[in-house]
Amino acid sequence: MTGKEKKLWGGRFQEKPSSILERIGESVSFDHKLYKEDIQGSIAHARMLKQIGILSGDELSKIETSLSQIKTELEEGKLEFKSELEDIHMHIESRLTELIGETGKKLHTARSRNDQVTQDVRLYILGRGKEILRSIVSLRFSLYEKAKRSVDVIIPGYTHLQVAQPIRASQYLLSWFWALERDQEFFRFALKASDELALGGGAMAGVNYATDREFLKKELGLSKVSPNSMDGVSSRDHILEFLFACTQLMIHASRICEDIILYSSQEFGILKLSDSLTTGSSIMPQKKNPDIAELIRGKAGRVIGNLNHLLVMLKGLPSTYNRDLQEDKLALFDSVETVEISLEGIREMIEDWVWVPERAESSLKNGFATATDLADFLVYEKKVPFRTAHELVGTLVRVCVEQKRTLFDLPEPDRIAVSEHFVGKEYENAVSLSLSADKKISYGGTSKKRQEEQLKIALESLKQTETLFL
């Protein structure tokens, strides 16, 4: 069989396609991942063709049976991919024609690859997007469970990567719980853009058949029909919105991983990862490297790049379909797979790590973490104006630094030299690490009472996710 005969669009051409055309034009090496969606869409399309009298009942039965066989062949690796057939859509149609002859050639009636492909991608996003949503919910549940067990663990909270104030470890974990809730809602919003029927738009102007697009919408379980054939086949907004959601999620993932990398380092040391989630060095025997966190941090850049790739590609395209759009799937597939494995990796690290309270306490003391509490003590108890209190405590910290001491072991005479109020039990309570967190009584704060309150709200948030997958 000649190259010309193998091309399903070859009637207009007399010359065989060049090698470079086939090599640069093939996409089956990556778009084979759409085979399930392509077969799902083709079955729905065939049923619609039967509804409008293009196919008989017997022909529909043959097509459905053969498409099911092709799906099995693809899953078992029995269908050979050929560059001359370009993409997964042509492979499936070509194989269908091999199996049932002329009947198979009827399937593409009232359909273009333009509307076929964009519909496949929409179905793919809906399916994989829901799996990502499940993974986000699973990660949020892991954060919630660890937060429940970490309420009584006091760790440093950091600003500018310097010790700032004591917080309960649960407050830290819940901060990411709520960030991921926003990611969850972003994905729910983004998936709505794919919940639309583009199939039936043809190449771009519609088709010369009285197709039943409402029937197709119901067959594919979609909520709406694209009202304009040109927009339906050419828009990639559904991919953009999905990649925006992936990007925001991966930015959060990267920052979580940055925390894990820092907090597990010898310089911080407030958490430990088990050996099973770390690696060693080929030359330095002492090393224990947080490779999962580092790799996810690196992968976040790829997902950001995928979004940028699509943005730049789309901004210069004229209306409707252009072959450039073939490249959108590379960005999409890579982002989906990267997000999925990153969520799994972060969940395992969160469930695995253990806090190191003694290192946390040392960092808090050496970092003067209760300096703000001491200033507030002067304001509340001694009626000192806050700016004056701020200056007095700042002076006290400077004295501690000069003497290489902390707020806890600076001799009382040196404290009194700064302020007469820096004495006795009142002073000790003001700088106490164990009391500091419970002084943060504002809503959303890190006191134990507010943490218990926040955990209840978090649990309610998780319960609401049960309806996402009904």
UniProtKB/Swiss-Prot annotation:
- PROSITE patterns found in the cross-reference section: FUMARATE_LYASES
Q: Which GO molecular-function terms appear in the entry? A: argininosuccinate lyase activity
Q: Which GO terms describe its cellular component?
A: cytosol
What is the main EC category here?
Answer: lyase
Matches recorded under Pfam families: ASL_C2, Lyase_1
InterPro entries on file: Arg_succ_lyase_C (IPR029419), Argininosuccinate_lyase (IPR009049), Fumarase/histidase_N (IPR024083), Fumarate_lyase_CS (IPR020557), Fumarate_lyase_fam (IPR000362), Fumarate_lyase_N (IPR022761), L-Aspartase-like (IPR008948)
Q: Does the keyword Amino-acid biosynthesis apply?
A: yes
Protein location: Cytoplasm
By sequence similarity, the record places it as follows: Belongs to the lyase 1 family. Argininosuccinate lyase subfamily.
| Name recorded for this polypeptide | Argininosuccinate lyase
Source species: Leptospira borgpetersenii serovar Hardjo-bovis (strain JB197)
